C-alpha cells in the first residue's frame, strides 16, 4: 500500500508534497515567482502564498510574463455542487479573490451541477441544482467583483455544450481513460464530461490560470494536450495543499465525514463544540508532561488551521509555535483561540452569504462579464 494517495476523488494518508510534485510532474512554486507576483501587483502577498499553502504550479511563470508584456490572463475555477461547502472548499476561493483584485482580471466560476449528477449515483439532477444555488451564495460571499466575475451553471449555460463539441473531437477515449480511470461500467455522460470542464479555458484568447487543490490537476492535463492544436494556450495552474479534517493531518477535510469538517453554514456555537471535541492536537499525555517536554505543533490540526487561514499575523503565529514547543501554553488554550477565530469567520461569512441572495442575478446574468458571455458568439477556432 502507498503511504499516501491523491486522486481527483480521494486523498488518503499524510501527503508528502515534494513527492507529489514529482509524481504529478508539476513545478515547485518558488520564492522568485512569489517575489515577481509581489513586484507586479505592488501588494504584499497573502498568507496562502507566503506560507506556501500554494506550493506548486504549471506555467505560472508564463502567466506572469504574459501579464508583464500586456497580454493579460484570466482566472477560471469551479465547484461541484454535491452538498454544503466547508472551510476546505472555500480557502482556494479567497486566494482567487486576491489574484482577481490585484491583477484586475476576469474570473469564470463553473458550477458543475451536471457532473455531480453523472458521477454521484445517489444525487438527483434537481438536487444538484439546489446545491448549486446554495454553493453560489458561499462563493459570492468571498467578495468577488460582480462585473469581472461570471458564475454559471452548466445546466443553464447550454452554450458550453456547443463549445465542448470540438473539444470532444480532440479527446480520445484512451486519453480520458488514462487520466480518469474510466471502465466498462462508466456512464457515457462521465466520459464526455472532461470536454465540458475544459471549455471555459477557451472563454478568452488569453492564458487561463486555475487556482485549485492539487488533486484537481488531472482534469487539466487533457486540456494541455490539445489546446494549442485549437489555437489556444495551455491552461496554467496554481496548486494548493489540502486543509486537513479535524481528526488528523492525513487526507483532507471531507463533507462526507461531518465530524471532521466545519461547514460554512454551521451554527458558530456548534462549530466551536465540534472543534473542542474532535480537533487533534500535538499535546502530551498530561499537562505536567507538556510543560516539561513541550507540545508538538507540527502534529497539531489546531496549529495547522491557524497556519493555513485563521492567523494572518506572522509574528503571532511564530510566537504561538515557540510557546507550544517550550511548553508555555496548553492545548485547551490553543483550541479556545482557534474556536474564537472560526466563530468570528462564520458569523461574518454568513452575514455576507445572506446579502449574496440579492447579488446572485448580477454574477450569473446581468453583470458586465456575465452579459458579455451570454451575448458572445462561439469563438472562431471552436467553429472550425
Swiss-Prot record:
PROSITE patterns linked to this entry: AA_TRNA_LIGASE_I
Molecular function, one GO term: ATP binding
GO BP annotations, alphabetical order: tryptophanyl-tRNA aminoacylation
Catalytic activity: tRNA(Trp) + L-tryptophan + ATP = L-tryptophyl-tRNA(Trp) + AMP + diphosphate + H(+)
A Pfam family hit: tRNA-synt_1b
Chain location of the short sequence motif 'HIGH' region per the record: 81-89
Motif 'KMSKS' region, residue numbers: 252-256
EC number: 6.1.1.2
SUPFAM superfamilies the UniProt entry points to: Nucleotidylyl transferase
Broad class of where this protein is predominantly found: cytoplasm
Listed GO CC annotations: cytoplasm
Keyword Aminoacyl-tRNA synthetase found: yes
Compartments it resides in: Cytoplasm
CDD domains: TrpRS_core
Record's keyword terms, sorted: Aminoacyl-tRNA synthetase, ATP-binding, Cytoplasm, Ligase, Nucleotide-binding, Protein biosynthesis
HAMAP family for the chain: Trp_tRNA_synth_A (MF_00140_A)
Similarity comment text for this entry: Belongs to the class-I aminoacyl-tRNA synthetase family.
Designated name of the protein: Tryptophan--tRNA ligase
Species in which this protein is naturally found: Thermococcus sibiricus (strain DSM 12597 / MM 739)
Taxonomic lineage from the root: Archaea, Methanobacteriati, Methanobacteriota, Thermococci, Thermococcales
